[in-house]
Amino acid sequence: MKKITFLTLVEVVEIHSDQIQHYGGSEGIRDMNLLSSAVAMPYVSFSGRFLHSDLYEMAAAYAFHICQNHPFVDGNKRTALASALIFLELNGVSISDSQGKLDEAVVSLASGDVNKVDFAKILRELR
């Protein structure tokens, strides 16, 4: 299996800052522990195997846990989606979303109407 490039805590904070600068809102981390937890979830493993089985599930883990943990003062959904997409891009996966399905999907993810597994399926469909 090809080595997977995961996002670091610093990179996710930079992604958040970029989202706020481009689209507005308040900068700041509301809870560093929740942010650290969210960023760690995609690469959690047990007995030498990742709990998230592929890149799409790992990307969905970034999106889901950043949305659910709400670690930033503002821009959590934007940061969640951007982190998932950047993670995929870093690992050679391009997503094409000409109809804007991901914006709606991340709002549904944050509200609990879409779960992590469903979000991973959406990402797979848009590759």
What is the predicted function of each stretch?
Residues M1-R127:
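FIC/Doc superfamily catalytic core
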